[in-house]
A protein has these predicted regions:
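Residues lining hydrophobic/aromatic ligand-binding pockets adjacent to catalytic sites
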Residues: 1-214
């Protein structure tokens, strides 16, 4: 969605989801895949921007070693090796700060330049579709780019139309691409694409996998 937007809103004042993708992702390995999770203190599952990382566990060093070890054979390993090392050597107290840093890394590598805003800064009290509409209004948006799975069943499209905001549905058609370690396995972290196809190749593959409709 960032590739089709001028402004990206990080929805950080919504509830953290246990076993979701807010603190974990998958990478390719010579044995198949590995799930890398960032340990967090999430008692009662507060909002994402309140989640504190459990840095007593040596997760950062382990994840860095796992990524570098498994992607050493990749064609573009040397291009991204240093950036990965720098990213995982930084210390983060809150999950939101880590996720923001990762997003900025990807944006920089793919030369995607939307402005980033945190929903918590807008102080929109509504929930669900009303919250999204409130955010769009606060930012004077002309259109809103969203995925299809949640939006088509929960978004109140008529409310957006009344506010002269066009909703654009973006469907991601998962690409099949050349991947190290054997047969292709889908739903990996974007770093899998970067290591295998570089900046230019990753951007082209992603652009060709997006279908947008109103």
């Amino acid at each position: 969605k960032m590739m089709n937007s001028e402004l990206f809103v990080f929805l950080d004042d919504v509830q953290f989801r246990k076993k979701g993708w807010q603190n974990r992702n998958r990478i390719r390995t010579n044995k198949g895949t590995a799930l890398l999770s960032v340990p967090v203190h999430a008692h009662l599952y507060p909002n994402i921007n309140k989640i504190v990382i459990d840095n007593d566990k040596n997760w950062s060093s382990k994840h860095k070693k796992s990524i570098l070890y498994n992607y050493t054979p990749a064609p573009y390993f040397e291009e991204f090796k240093n950036s990965i090392e720098v990213l995982f050597e930084k210390k983060f107290e809150c999950l939101i700060d880590l996720n923001t840093e990762i997003i900025k890394f990807v944006m920089n590598e793919l030369e995607i330049k939307p402005k980033i805003i945190f929903s918590s800064d807008l102080k929109i009290s509504q929930n669900g579709s009303d919250k999204v509409l409130g955010i769009c209004k606060a930012l004077n948006a002309d259109y809103y780019v969203t995925g299809t799975s949640w939006a088509k069943s929960h978004l109140k499209i008529e409310d957006f139309k009344k506010s002269n905001i066009t909703v654009k549905f973006q469907e991601f058609q998962h690409p099949i691409y050349t991947q190290i370690h054997g047969k292709f396995i889908p739903k990996m972290s974007v770093i899998d694409l970067l290591f295998n196809h570089g900046k230019k190749g990753t951007k082209e593959i992603l652009q060709n996998s997006i279908v947008t409709s109103s």
